[in-house]
Amino acid sequence: MKRKRVVSEHYVNNKEFLEALIVFKAKCLAAKEAGEPRPQISNYIGECFLKIATHLSYKPNFVNYMFREDMICDGIENCVQYIENFNPEKSKNPFAYFTQIIYYAFLRRIQKEKRQLEIKNKILDKSGYEVAFHTDD
């Protein structure tokens, strides 16, 4: 009796992702030589960016933030922005490359939200908001 082969549980296939990026990079070079704008990213590459960002947001250090969707959007935006910087000759691991981009995008969003919260708190302190709503017991 033969055993069924266990299917990998990874949500992004690194080899297929690398092949899609190589094809996209070739299209970018051809468009650049022809003087045309950068071609649109394929649905598969976009889906990989979304999966990486979504699954990274489930890590314990990111899961409880109220602005998690904004973090995911920032991560995807940065991946699209820096997709041409990925060099398949240097690295054969696009999953790690884009995970790092998304990770640091998450950290930047957290810092940005903390600054906004500090600004809100300073405005409330200066406006005397607490004094107006303080009750005498």
Question: In which residue ranges do the predicted regions lie?
Answer:
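Alpha-helical interaction segments
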Residues: M1, V7, N14, I76, ...
